[in-house]
Design a protein with these regions (language model features):
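Short aromatic-enriched loop/helix-cap "lid" or pocket-rim segments at secondary-structure transitions
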Residues: 14-19, 71, 103-104, 161-164, ...
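Active-site gating/metal-coordination segments in enzymes
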Residues: 55-56, 64-157, 161
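Generic structural signal for well-ordered alpha-helices
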Residues: 42-46, 74-81, 105-106, 134-138, ...
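Active-site environment of divalent metal-dependent phosphoester hydrolases
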Residues: 10-13, 64-67, 96-100, 123-125, ...
Length: 280
């Protein structure tokens, strides 16, 4: 079984003319200003899943500043889950600084979504204000069966690119320490914080409820990142994610084949870990 845990879907009107939605949405413009940045709908996704051998995709929208846009995008995700039962699962997405974020999380969970994500703090990093804004949403997730929250992270070093935030490893660690009971997925390998699982003190405890997805891995890391996750003892917490439509799964399949993982370990990453995590 192959489960892609990191996929983005948008309403058709945004796919047709994204430029109409740049005003007042600096984060969206930052990531999608280039016409080469692909935008997809549910039918596009299913066609790609069938082509690439993906059984299930976990999809989300975008953390729009405009609450109406956030609701509309979440409605598209809900519709996709209902249209393709067993193939698509969904996460609610919004700007957590919005006063109605927790209620929107509840609405989406009631409608059948499986958690929250990909939440992002593209311009600020995960600072104290960001942590405080997460509190009501994290409480909702705990109260609803400890559903997961996926949060955008990135490596604090290296080349710049659209969507690279000023987040630090200290901030990522503080996120884990602030919400020790929540199940949190750190997108994009958690900015590399999983390497610190090899430390003898503190980090293993701090990161006990943290998972890591592989989204954009082929742009960021050598295939040895999978071997390092294995050596760090966190391979069972690695979730396959493509960031589709940014990348298709076959790029990741090839990357995994270049790693030193066994067939059984590759199967863990590609789907078994996510099946356990999401209860498939």
């Amino acid at each position: 079984m192959i489960i892609d845990t990191h996929v983005h879907l948008f309403p058709d009107k945004i796919k047709e003319d994204r430029t109409l939605f740049f005003d007042g949405e600096p984060e969206f413009k930052l990531l999608y200003d280039s016409p080469r940045s692909p935008i997809a709908g549910a039918d596009d996704l299913i066609a790609t899943m069938d082509e690439q051998g993906v059984d299930i995709s976990v999809v989300s929208g975008f953390p729009w500043r405009n609450p109406d846009l956030a609701r509309q995008n979440n409605d598209i995700v809900i519709e996709a889950v209902l249209k393709y039962p067993g193939r698509i699962r969904g996460l609610a997405c919004f700007d957590v600084s919005w006063a109605g974020a927790a209620k929107e999380a509840e609405r989406c969970i009631d409608a059948g979504l499986s958690g929250v994500g990909e939440l992002a703090f593209y311009l600020s990093g995960i600072d104290r204000t960001a942590l405080e804004s997460l509190v009501p949403v994290m409480e909702v997730l705990r109260n609803r069966g400890n559903l997961p929250c996926m949060i955008h992270t990135n490596e604090p070093l290296g080349h710049a690119y659209p969507g690279k935030t000023p987040v630090t490893l200290e901030q990522i660690n503080e996120l884990a320490r602030t919400f020790p009971e929540n199940r949190i997925i750190l997108a994009h390998w958690g900015g590399g914080i999983f390497f610190y699982h090899i430390m003898k003190k503190q980090l293993k405890t701090d990161l006990k409820n943290i998972w890591y997805d592989t989204a954009a891995s082929v742009f960021l890391y050598d295939s040895a990142v999978y071997d390092m996750a294995d050596r760090a003892g966190v391979l069972d917490k690695v979730l396959f994610g493509t960031d589709y439509p940014l990348l298709k799964p076959d790029r990741y399949y090839a990357d995994l084949d270049r790693s030193g993982l066994t067939r059984e370990q590759k199967e863990m990453v590609l789907g078994k870990n996510a099946a356990v995590f999401y209860g498939n």
